[in-house]
């Protein structure tokens, strides 16, 4: 049997909102398997649906860039929020985002690329920046979207300056490349930033995630004591709601609260082919520090 630690119980409680004793029991029943423990709590009606993202604590910036029918986005991490306001760091993120337009999404290829205006690579420039600023930094990930005929749009939420912020979205829309489509692309970016969908269409939903969800929903429905035929209908309705939560094209358009995203896109005579959403530090664990400690750490180099 796995050793159930206090940290595991705390983590499960943060993920589900369930009570401490319930979380401990769930971990004991599932031999310490965190994912199975979440499902166990949900089946018992002791937890809300699993949260879609991990704890976010890392600092740095998300940067976007455009050129013609392509748009790119990168995430560059640092240790403290102070660095995000550093001009040299901002310039580095902007440059790497622009490089991704031609180099592509592969982070190793990006690091090996020549840094514009210098006689060394992006990786070497990053080493130099680390030495100057005094903090560890890393290029975590990159994404590029491209269209044949249409608009590659982007949206940055809470931008410190144009193209730099903590949440970034890329959107690929095929259609007539005009101002109206560009506006729609930005609106979809805002929608994605707010609703955090996991998939573009129902066909893109991870089959294993869907099966897990169905199993949980069926168990919840059976707890009602209703006949199996009624339970099947209940599960169908809840699966539809699941799709509306996680599938972009099935979601309700945040800008009017009524239409489906798919209808909005179709009405514009366009096709939404891809979206990418980066949240700074998504899924990265970082030891919590108070503001005074962060100031002291920054001052001490």
From Swiss-Prot:
One of its GO terms (cellular component) is cytoplasm. CDD domains: UBA_EF-Ts. Signal peptide: none annotated. GO terms for molecular function: translation elongation factor activity. InterPro entries: EF-Ts_dimer_sf, Transl_elong_EFTs/EF1B, Transl_elong_EFTs/EF1B_dimer, Transl_elong_Ts_CS, UBA-like_sf. Gene3D superfamilies: 1.10.286.20, DNA helicase RuvA subunit, C-terminal domain, Elongation factor Ts, dimerisation domain. Transmembrane segments: none annotated. Residues 80-83 are annotated as: Involved in Mg(2+) ion dislocation from EF-Tu. Keywords: Cytoplasm, Elongation factor, Protein biosynthesis. It is found in: Cytoplasm. Belongs to the EF-Ts family. Associates with the EF-Tu.GDP complex and induces the exchange of GDP to GTP. It remains bound to the aminoacyl-tRNA.EF-Tu.GTP complex up to the GTP hydrolysis stage on the ribosome. This is Elongation factor Ts. It comes from Acidiphilium cryptum (strain JF-5).
């Amino acid at each position: 049997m796995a050793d159930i630690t206090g940290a595991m119980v705390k983590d499960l409680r943060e993920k589900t909102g369930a009570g401490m004793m319930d979380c401990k029991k769930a971990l004991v029943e599932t031999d310490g398997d965190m994912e199975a423990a979440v499902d166990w709590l949900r089946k018992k009606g002791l937890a809300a649906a699993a949260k879609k993202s991990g704890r976010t604590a890392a600092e740095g910036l998300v940067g976007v860039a455009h050129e013609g029918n392509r748009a790119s986005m990168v995430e560059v991490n640092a240790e403290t929020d102070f660095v995000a306001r550093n001009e040299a760091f901002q310039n580095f993120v902007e440059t790497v985002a622009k490089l991704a337009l031609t180099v592509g999404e592969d982070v190793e290829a990006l690091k090996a690329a020549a840094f514009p205006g210098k006689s060394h690579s992006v990786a070497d420039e990053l080493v130099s920046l680390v030495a100057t600023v005094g903090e560890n930094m890393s290029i975590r990930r990159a994404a590029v979207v491209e269209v044949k005929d249409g608009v590659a749009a982007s949206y940055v939420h809470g931008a410190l300056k144009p193209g730099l912020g903590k949440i970034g979205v890329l959107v690929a829309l095929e259609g007539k490349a005009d101002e109206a489509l560009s506006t729609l692309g930005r609106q979809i970016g805002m929608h994605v930033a707010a609703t955090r969908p996991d998939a573009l269409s129902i066909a893109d939903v991870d089959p294993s995630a869907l099966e897990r969800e169905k199993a949980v929903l069926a168990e919840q429905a059976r707890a009602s004591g209703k006949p199996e035929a009624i339970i099947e209908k209940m599960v169908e309705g809840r699966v539809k709601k699941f799709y509306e939560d996680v599938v972009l094209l099935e979601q309700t358009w945040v800008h009017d609260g009524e239409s489906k995203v798919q209808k909005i896109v179709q009405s514009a005579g366009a096709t939404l082919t891809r979206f990418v959403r980066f949240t700074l530090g998504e899924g990265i664990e970082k030891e919590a520090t108070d503001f005074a400690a962060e100031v002291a750490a920054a001052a001490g180099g």
